[in-house]
A protein has these predicted regions:
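Structured-RNA-binding interfaces characteristic of tRNA pseudouridine synthases
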Residues: 1-249
Length: 249
């Protein structure tokens, strides 16, 4: 039996998703929780490898219980896990899937959202969930950022928006949708695609902020993409503003 479980977590107190001995990770907590629920060691596989400090509102995992372990109806799994879960991690829903299903390789789309709060003073209630950018942007920042965002749509080689040192050979990805939203002091960049390179969304967010601040022009984006050079794009935004928002299969 294999379960597909949708989870949510705050990334501030985690060293990323992937298990690391001696460090608190999402996968490490899931291993502990699932072992308690099913009475034995489970195989837990994630849809992505989020970095330290990155959160998720809709992260998908598969759980494969041990042979001979406790059998739990899928709809009851979130409540069965609740007593063992920490406060910054929750099971949202669960269902059974075929043994051939893979939570990472069967993904059709992922939506990430990056949140930037532009203010000289931070908001303690948003600590660990936004990039606190201590500069007030120009009044024309939002239309400039939206104009730049259009250039990311479609299928492109996004090598310029990948962290240096990554060993990925195929750097072509497709962006299906992109929005730049503003509410009060909070700017949110929403990006939906078929997959993302290492730090890609954070570099896109940093680049859009540079456009909003006047350090880059909206029409610079096609040239940056074509260059395939990381140094041409903007800064890598910090991890705390990033959330995996939605995964579809």
């Amino acid at each position: 039996m294999k379960y597909l479980v949708r989870i949510a977590y705050l990334g501030e107190q985690f060293y990323g998703f992937q298990y690391q001995p001696g460090r608190r990770t999402v996968q490490g907590e899931l291993n502990r929780v699932c072992e308690s629920v099913f009475g034995g060691v489970c195989r837990v596989t994630g849809c992505s490898r989020t970095d330290r400090g990155v959160s998720a509102r809709d992260f998908c995992i598969t759980v494969e219980p041990p042979a001979g372990g406790v059998r739990i109806p899928a709809k009851r799994l979130p409540l069965a896990a609740l007593p063992y879960l920490p406060r910054d991690l929750v099971f949202l829903s669960a269902k059974t899937v075929p043994d051939s299903f893979h939570p990472r390789y069967d993904v059709k789309t992922k939506e990430y959202r990056y949140s930037i709060r532009c203010s000289p003073t931070p908001d303690p209630f948003l600590s660990g969930q936004v990039w606190e950018y201590p500069v007030t942007l120009p009044k024309n920042a939002l239309p400039r950022m939206r104009a730049a965002a259009v250039h990311f749509l479609g299928k492109h080689d996004f090598a310029a928006f990948m962290a240096q040192g990554s060993d990925v050979k195929d750097t072509t990805r497709t962006i299906f949708g992109m929005k730049v939203l503003k509410k009060g002091k909070l700017i949110t960049v929403s990006v939906t695609g078929d997959g993302f390179l290492y730090n890609m969304v954070r570099i896109i967010a940093g680049t859009l902020l540079d456009v909003g601040a006047g350090k880059l022009e909206p029409d610079d984006i096609p040239q940056i993409i074509a260059s395939k050079e990381r140094k041409r794009a903007g800064v890598t935004a910090p991890p705390e503003g990033l959330s995996l928002w939605k995964v579809t299969y």
